Amino acid sequence: TFRMSRQPQRIEVVKGKGSETTDALLGVLLRAPDMYDFGAELVVVGHGGSVHPMNEHGLRYEAGRMTQFWGLRMSKQGQLVEELLDPPPNICRNVLSLGQRRGLKKLDAVITAPTLRSDGAVLATAGYDASTRLLFDCDDHPIDVPMDPSRKEAILALDFLWKPFSDFPFVSALDRAVHLAAMITAAVRPTLPTSPAFGYDAPVQGSGKTLLGRCVGMLTEGKDPSVWPHTAGRDDEEVRKRLFTVLRSGFRCMVWDNVVGQFDSAALASALTSPTFSDRILGASLSSTV
């Protein structure tokens, strides 16, 4: 896939007109195909559907790609001449401080394969879908999804989905059903307000628990997901920070690996039972909700 790049728009910088300049930059961001409001954060969607939160320096770079700021100055000869300018830091800070008042396209998640809307309709058209606030970023070979599948087609699809796991040593039919539920949940998770976590347990190490989790992650991420080793800090702070980092980065799957003993986390319980998660941004006196 590729995205068209427009001729940079010119924005004049006039002393005492900061609000007007901010509004002009907002107008450019509103028309940009890869800029979104992700909760209260301004983000840019990069290659492969990756979500990158913007800070002041990142926004100055993106603004410089899309716009050419300029102003008038007095030359030595006493004439007004045009001067090209970099994106003003104060204007970028204004944009970031507006939060959800920016009014950009609202983004909940980036998907790389078709999914189901909450009304049961199939979302299979590439691009941004305003009703679900999802961005479908597919490759050059989109999946053809039958809109009215027969029972035979559904059974064939189930057989195809389960084939890689047909020889895996699950203990019982219940264990196989849990893994199937995890895969189906992964496919529709972007349109669900909340969903359960799925745990894999075994009496010995090296039995394939992490592999199963990674397979589920590939269904929702479109690539091998990141694996995070278990942390056992003195309190819940490290878990909370890690969860917020993952959610803020737009990851759709988190493989929490090698849990030994009891895992009791209020932060994890909150993330699983609420459609949003709030925390303080590390290194800043600001909080954000994703």
Which residues does each PLM region occupy?
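N-terminal nucleic-acid engagement/recognition segments and initiation subdomains in replication
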Residues: 1-174, 181, 185, 191, ...
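Contiguous, well-ordered alpha-helical segments that form the cores/surfaces of helical PPI scaffolds
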Residues: 177-189, 214-218, 270
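Pre-Walker A (Motif I) flank of P-loop NTPase domains
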Residues: 193-198, 251-252
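Walker A/P-loop
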Residues: 198-228
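Short glycine-rich substrate-engagement loop in P-loop NTPases that contacts/grips substrate
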Residues: 223-247
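Conserved catalytic network of the ASCE P-loop NTPase/AAA+ motor domain
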Residues: 245-249, 261, 287-290
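Conserved AAA+/SF3 P-loop NTPase catalytic/coupling segment centered on the Walker-B
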Residues: 251-273
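Conserved catalytic/switch belt of AAA+ P-loop NTPases
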Residues: 265-288
